[in-house]
C-alpha cells in the first residue's frame, strides 16, 4: 500500500499547488476522514461502532477516488463488496482508476464510470425495473459547489427529482444530493459536502430542503469553517441523509 499512499500524497501536493483547479479532484484528508467515519458506522445504532460489511459504496463525483479509498481503509480490504465511482473529467477519471489499483484494489472490486452524473448517463443506474434498481449501502460525495447546469423540460419528470423538484440552474447542489439519495438503500447512509448556502437559500432550494426535512431524511448537519478547501474559501457543511 506504500505505493498507493505515495500516489495520494503526490495528488495532495499537486492539489495544494494548483489552487482553484484542485476542487475538481481532491477532498482534503481531514474532511474525507469525517465522511468515511460517518458512513461506516451502523446507520441504525451508531454507538455500536463500525458496520461489519458494506456490500457497496458509491461516490458519484469521485475525483481522484480518495473518499472511496478512505471508506475502504476503515472497512478493511475485505469489508466492502464493490466500490463504485463516477467522474466527468477524463483526466481525473484516469487518476481515480490508477489510485484504486495502486492501493491494491483489484479491477473486479471497483467500477468507475466516465460520465455526467446529472445527466445520469451510466446505463447501470438507468435500470427501469424497480426490482433491479441499483442501491448502495454507503454514499459519499464532494460534488462541485454551486455548479451551473441546464436541466431540460424532461428532467422535471426524472425519477430522481420529480418528488422534490429541480434545483435551480445557478446551483446544482441539491440536484447532486437528490441523485445520490435516490440510489441510497433504505438502511444506508449518505454523507455529502455542500456549500453553506444550501441551508438557507430560498426558492426551489427551500422547497427541496423543506420536503427533505419534513420527510425526516436529513439526519445530521455539520457546519465546517471557511478556507478548508484549496478551491474555495467559502464555509461548507456536511449533510448526512438516511431513508
Model-derived segments and their meaning:
Residues 184-189:
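Short glycine-dipeptide loop
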Residues 224-229:
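Short, solvent-exposed loop/turn elements at beta->coil junctions and helix N-caps
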Residues 78-79, 232-234:
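Short, solvent-exposed loop/turn segments at the edges of secondary structure
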Residues 162-169:
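A short acidic, glycine-rich active-site loop
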Residues 236-243:
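Conserved beta strand-loop-helix elements of the APE1-like EEP
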Residues 1-19:
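Long recognition/docking surfaces used for binding and targeting
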Residues 24-141, 146-148, 153-155, 160-162, ...:
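Conserved S-adenosyl-L-methionine
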Amino acid at each position: 500500500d506504500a505505493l498507493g499512499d505515495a500516489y495520494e500524497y503526490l495528488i495532495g501536493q499537486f492539489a495544494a499547488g494548483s489552487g482553484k483547479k484542485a476542487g475538481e479532484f481532491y477532498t482534503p484528508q481531514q474532511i474525507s476522514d469525517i465522511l468515511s467515519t460517518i458512513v461506516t458506522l451502523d446507520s441504525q445504532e451508531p454507538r455500536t461502532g463500525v458496520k461489519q460489511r458494506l456490500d457497496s459504496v458509491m461516490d458519484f463525483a469521485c475525483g481522484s477516488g480518495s473518499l472511496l479509498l478512505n471508506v475502504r481503509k476503515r472497512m478493511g480490504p475485505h469489508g466492502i463488496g464493490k466500490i463504485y465511482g463516477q467522474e466527468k473529467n477524463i483526466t481525473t477519471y484516469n487518476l481515480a482508476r490508477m489510485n484504486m489499483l495502486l492501493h491494491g484494489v483489484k479491477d473486479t472490486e471497483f467500477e468507475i464510470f466516465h460520465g455526467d452524473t446529472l445527466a445520469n448517463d451510466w446505463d447501470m443506474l438507468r435500470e427501469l425495473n424497480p426490482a433491479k434498481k441499483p442501491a448502495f449501502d454507503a454514499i459519499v460525495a464532494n460534488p462541485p459547489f454551486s455548479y451551473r447546469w441546464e436541466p431540460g423540460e424532461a428532467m422535471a419528470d426524472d425519477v430522481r427529482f420529480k418528488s422534490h423538484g429541480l434545483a435551480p440552474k445557478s446551483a446544482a447542489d441539491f440536484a447532486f444530493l437528490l441523485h445520490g439519495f435516490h440510489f441510497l438503500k433504505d438502511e444506508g447512509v449518505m454523507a455529502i459536502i455542500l456549500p453553506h448556502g444550501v441551508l438557507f437559500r430560498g426558492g426551489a432550494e427551500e422547497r427541496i430542503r423543506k420536503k427533505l426535512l419534513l420527510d425526516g431524511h436529513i439526519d445530521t448537519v455539520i457546519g465546517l469553517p471557511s478556507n478548508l478547501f484549496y478551491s474555495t474559501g467559502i464555509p461548507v457543511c456536511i449533510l448526512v441523509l438516511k431513508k
